[in-house]
C-alpha cells in the first residue's frame, strides 16, 4: 500500500527547486568588536573636521586619522601617546530591537604618533559601544553625533596632541555638559568601556578642577571687607539667643498652666 505524500507532488508547468533545510539559531551579538563599528561612527565627518583643524594648527605637518576598533586602552607601541575622552555624548540605536537611547557617557580612545623626521603623524581612534539593555545588542547609529559635538571633541584631541607630541603648553580643554553627573544611573554591565576597565561615569579631573576653583573663589572672603565685619550678623544660635528663646518657652508654659488652673 502506497502512502500519499502531497508535498512530493510537482506541477509540470512550474517547478520550484528544493530548498535546503537549516536550523535557526537565536544568538545575541556580544561585545566583541567587528568591522561594522568602523562604518557606524561617521568616519567621513570625523576626518573632515580633524583635517581642517590640523591644517590650521600644524600646516607644515601631515596627519592621518584612522578608525581602529581593535584599539586597546593603555596598550601603546613605543613612541605612541594616548588621550581618552571620557564624557562624550552620543545617541545609540539598536539594530536588533530598534531601541534608541541617549548616553552622556560615551568613551572615545585616541592613540597618537608623530614622526618628526618625516613631519607626519597618525591618530588611531576607537569609539566604545554600549549594549542595548532591552535586548542585549547595540551599535552606534551613524547620526549619533552632531557636527558641533564632533568639533569640540576634535578640539580636545588636538589640544592633547600638541601637548604630548609637540611639547606645547597653554591649551584649554572643552568640558562638555555631559561630563557633569546626572540623575541617570550608568549601567556598566552594558558598557564596552566599563567591561575593559575604563572608569568614566564619574566627573573627569578637568571638571573637578573647574568646580574646585569655582568653589574656592565663591567661598573666599572679600579682601576689602574687614575681619570684624564678617561676624557682625545676627547669629540666632548663639548663647544669648538660646537663653532668650528658653525664657519665652517657659513663659508660654507658665501662662498655659495658669490659664488651666483658673478654669
Swiss-Prot record:
Molecular function per GO: olfactory receptor binding; zinc ion binding
Ranges per topology, Cytoplasmic: 1-238
Zinc fingers, 3CxxC-type class: 88-197
Pfam families: Zn_ribbon_3CxxC (PF13695)
Parts of the chain that traverse the membrane: 239-259
Assembly mode: Interacts with olfactory receptors.
Function: Specifically promotes functional cell surface expression of olfactory receptors, but not of other GPCRs.
Signal peptide start and end residues: none
Domain of life, source organism: Eukaryota
InterPro entries reported in the protein's UniProt record: R-trans_p, ZAR1/RTP1-5-like_Znf-3CxxC
Keyword Metal-binding appears in the UniProt entry: yes
Membrane topology per record: Single-pass type III membrane protein
Extracellular side: 260-263
A GO term from the CC aspect: cell surface
Keyword annotations: Cell membrane, Membrane, Metal-binding, Transmembrane, Transmembrane helix, Zinc, Zinc-finger
Name of the protein in its database record: Receptor-transporting protein 1
Family according to the record: Belongs to the TMEM7 family.
Gene: RTP1
